[in-house]
């Protein structure tokens, strides 16, 4: 019954959705980074935007981001609740990331980033359980900023997916598949399939994602 109600709500939302692409409502992006961090920068440029997990909830309603939205409107996950997680850029990312200095977060001074560590992981355990109790299907966007910062953190998501059948994850990682963290992320795709839809940045092909230089031809 709960799933039918959420699907009906998604259908109403789909009919109401409007085009929010930047090329329709404002100036198209130039492809040139507006703010470039120093090569030695190790964390966010905006330390005042850091939050402790106890300030939570750490999982935010997808409605807070117009490009994501709060609910899946079409497809096999129609009706799923969408939430997002934002960590500290660079502090949680591999140093090999091609976007280290030109990170999206450089132009996001007001976005709250949650400090990583055991308190974050404990908060995620609680919040995912509560969301999966309330909704038949929950889709988590990892990460608006930041990345998978440790093997223990990756293992947390493995446990959560095994524990909650209605949990789904999508996002990107800068960890190459040849690294320990990257190979674990790729292995989880084999285990959980589309429930763990995490792509590797900086490469093409299946499960890859890359930046196209501007201007395009």
Task: Provide a role label for each language-model segment.
Residues 1-217:
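Class I S-adenosyl-L-methionine
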